[in-house]
Amino acid sequence: MRHKRGGSKLGRLTAHRWALFRNLLTALFTHERITTTLAKAKAVRPLADHLVTLAKQDTLHARRQALTLVPDEMVVRRLFDTVGARYADRRGGYTRILQMGTRRGDAAPVAILELVDRPEVPKEKPDKGKKSTEPKGKEAKKARKAAAAAGRG
């Protein structure tokens, strides 16, 4: 019986599972949003919340504890400087899981794991009104041929 057994093994050995968690945590704190399977998101979420709690403490010991889970020093520095300061007044619930449906290849449930209250960066839309001045079709082929011939000469 499986009474009081916490966490999922995710079909991996212990070392492989912890390597997966480290990679997911590094990606999460680098990009502040990752897309992964629902099971992986649920497994990583408590670790991510714990790291934000460590970042709020901002002590040397807390940094060293964070480095055991996120081996990239630049990511830990960013975690303690920006993310920890952002959630200074929040008492928990630093991440959210948004379910996206299923993956096309194997029908695995996919989810987005993201930090709450993250600053929204607007995507730049390409200008549809501007047209390129380069010739298209046969004219482009002739122009390339002429440029190549001029370059050799």
What are these regions (language model features)?
Residues 1-153:
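Structured, basic alpha/beta domains of bacterial-type, RNA-associated proteins
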